[in-house]
Amino acid sequence: MKITVIGAGNVGATASLRIAEKQLAKEVVLIDIVEGIPQGKALDMYESGPVALFDTCIYGSNDYKDSENSDIVLITAGLARKPGMTREDLLMKNTAIIKEVTEQVMRYSKNPIIIMVSNPLDVMTYVAHTISGLAKERVIGMAGVLDTARFRSFIAEELNVSMQDINAFVLGGHGDSMVPIVKYTSIAGIPITELLPKEKIDAIVERTRNGGIEIVNHLKTGSAYYAPAASAVEMIEAIVKDRKRILPCTTMLNGQFGIDGVFCGVPVKLGKNGIEQILEINLSEYELEALQKSAALVEENCNSLQAVLS
């Protein structure tokens, strides 16, 4: 198993180390355009092997040729939004980056599974799918796993229970339009509505929507990377081990939930072939409407890129 991670920033480097520590691949390649950064970080990780007890070969490179014949490619490259930069500016700049990255990936790997982490997540997943020509089941966005992890952690904190006992789904887009599904949220099988009043649940939902911003406000410079990296690696592990995990991931819908031809976060079954099934669960009228509104925002942004991608 060969896994390539594009982008040697905090998310990419942290994910690379977790992949190695879990021994999910024989070979991990960390690629970045900045000379020396991927090489230095990868060497540092590799030298931790005897202590962390892994034998994975990790190396860094500035050359996409080193990604040749990758089974899985994790894309974390892209710019963060800077002061004075509009969302449209960020969208266009990162579209150009992801277009170039995807072209290079496909130049050297015939049929990889691509996992997208770069923002705006849902749109960048669409870009990678459009440019790669891969089957939609093999281009997957990491959003719902992270948003769900935040939702679960906040519930566990409020109830003072183990995070492992929290079951939940956060669907829709990665951002203000995400849709935490309270109906399917439970604690060791007990519906959350039996343990928390509506106002507490609503507050947790709102905190989840602002989870990324909360971290940015603390850090002042930079953004979250431990939880995003862990979420991406959970997806990779499900694929590598063919675990058939049911996880909320961004995928292209073809009529499910009344959404067609748009990438949106929904429950899927993840296995060795990528997305093996989309689970069209029953949603309340409000939840379905919120999910469709979220998808409409993604579609609007994708439509604005047609000239760039053609």
From Swiss-Prot:
What EC number(s) are associated with this protein in UniProt? 1.1.1.37
Q: Which residues participate in substrate binding? A: R81, R87, N119, R150
UniProt enzyme class: oxidoreductase
Catalytic activity line of the entry: (S)-malate + NAD(+) = oxaloacetate + NADH + H(+)
A GO BP term, please?
Answer: tricarboxylic acid cycle
Output the CDD domains linked to this UniProt entry: LDH-like_MDH
Q: Name one GO molecular function term.
A: L-malate dehydrogenase (NAD+) activity
Sorted keywords for this record are: NAD, Oxidoreductase, Tricarboxylic acid cycle
Q: Which cysteines are joined by disulfide bonds?
A: none
Keyword field contains Secreted: no
Q: Which InterPro entries match?
A: L-lactate/malate_DH, Lactate/malate_DH_C, Lactate/malate_DH_N, Lactate_DH/Glyco_Ohase_4_C, Malate_DH_type3, NAD(P)-bd_dom_sf
**Record-annotated residues binding NAD(+)?**
G7, A8, G9, N10, V11, G12, D32, N94, V117, S118, N119
**Highest taxon listed in the record's lineage:** Bacteria
Protein's job: Catalyzes the reversible oxidation of malate to oxaloacetate.
Family, according to the entry, reads as follows: Belongs to the LDH/MDH superfamily. MDH type 3 family.
Name recorded for this polypeptide: Malate dehydrogenase
Give the source species: Chlorobium limicola (strain DSM 245 / NBRC 103803 / 6330)
Q: What is the lineage of its organism?
A: Bacteria, Pseudomonadati, Chlorobiota, Chlorobiia, Chlorobiales
